[in-house]
Amino acid sequence: MKKILLIALAVGVIAACKQNNKTGATESNKNFAALTDQYYEEGLKLSPLSATFIGDERYNDLLPNDGSVAYLAESKAFNQRFLDSLSNYDRDNLNDNDKLSYDFLKDQLEMNIEGFKYHSEYLPFNQMFALPLTIGQLGSGTGAQPFKTVKNYQDWLKRVSAFSVWADTAIGNFKKGIQNGIVLPKSLVVKMIPQMQSMIVSKPEESLFYGPINLLPKDFSTDDKRRLTDEYRALITTVIIPTYKKLGDFLQNEYLPKARTTSGWSAMPGGAAWYAYLVRQQTTTKKTPEQVYQTGLNEVARIKSQMDSIKNLVGFKGDLKAFFEYMKTDKKFMPYKTPKEVLAAFENIHQRMIPNLKKMFAHAPKTPFEIRQTEAFRAASASAEYNQGSADGKRPGIFYVPILDATKFNITSGMESLFLHEAIPGHHYQISLTQENTSLPKFRRFGFHNAYVEGWALYCESLGKELGLYQDPYQHMGALGDEMHRAIRLVVDVAIHTKNMSREEAIKYMMDNEAISEEGATAEIERYMGIPAQALGYKTGAMKIRELRNKYEKELGAKFKIADFHTEVLKDGSLPLSVFESKMDAWAAKQK
């Protein structure tokens, strides 16, 4: 879910808190709402790409130079100023909703400020989280950047004109990283180079960025069409292609020779402390890397036992590793011939669970939903992902599936669990319902905590049987494989970054414990190398939601209603897990 990751890093805690106080708004609440209103507006100006992704078009012409010294200073001052402002409020005098807002803001602002001591700007992008890739999605004409009016087209011209300056700053920061020993592993850099080179074409018409011209609205005047076509051709030729060439050449000729052969964050100066911070940030807990690691080992052992049971159920003779190999390679598990067949299979999963969805969820989102094949230019390095729709419902939520070769798309990879996670009722339900709920403060509509958002999506994978899925033992095995995948992450992410586990050792550990190809395991391990601790939030959040569900089922007995539980989990938007747990406990107490 990379787009969501982008929004998390960019918009983070951008917050507004206009809300109705059912018990009567106090002066303190009114002032607090005004403060967070100001915070929201100033935050969007700092994060114009985030504004675009949530459907706010006011800043569609801006591309911040977010690695520059000036931008970083402005961003740090912004966070400190609003943290200082929070001290002017007595939390006890706020209403319940504003207490959640206060706790959210305080937690995130403190984390943001702490993060400035680690020079993340020295690693401006990698093979997965990269503005050069996001720019491609935005500029294709089919992404979050709108291309419906002449102004829309002009906004994009202004925005992408700043790409060259952004790239110069990124190169400068990469060089500072080299000087300070903060560099990416070579194995990641070699993946980044062809990504840049793929954008270099001989004719502007062959460029991904020519897409908006191919999609020019029919109601544009002839003069506007001619002018925009000329301007887009010129920009592609003079700005976009040279910028990608500049980035590719730098990575190839200067950065790659200086990139490190180690895999983990601890190999860099101050890397161990930096990683411990990232663990706390991504899990929204006070857990140490070692605690996360031990949880991972325990979960791997538990899930492995369940996998053995299914292996025995289907009568497979051999150990689990042989069973994994059988599922990965037997042609009967690869029945598709075309990408359309793969996409249709996912839609079939959707249709089969609709009756039970209505029993388990009292509310369904209004935001449209689509299943699409991932664009070719990024498919090789992409995972299946969800791109959120716009809050007004004009842009659908999209479940993207990378299909490099449909004939090799394996049904035992966990298609059902993947759909539950990335699409329905996972990310599409959680994000869309939250965005659509205009009674929520804006920070809850558009805010993001990795452990909550990804934890919810992983929890949804555990609902398969209740939703009428996982009837086939191989699909159930695929679901267990997906759960195992998230448990393995707790082990290898921490081991890579704190225990000197090599890239190759991590790939082997993953392949030994789940049915994944070497290509797939390599992409996953390199993801953890490039985005440390991000993958830890999934299992951490899912275990918390499941823990609370089990507790309330036991405490409430017949009074526990699963649809009401899911409504409460989702209704207040993304929260740090500690704040979320307190809120849920208060809800459960009212059910007794």
Where is each model-derived feature located?
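Sec-dependent N-terminal signal peptides
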Residues: 4-12
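N-terminal maturation segment of proteins
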Residues: 17-592
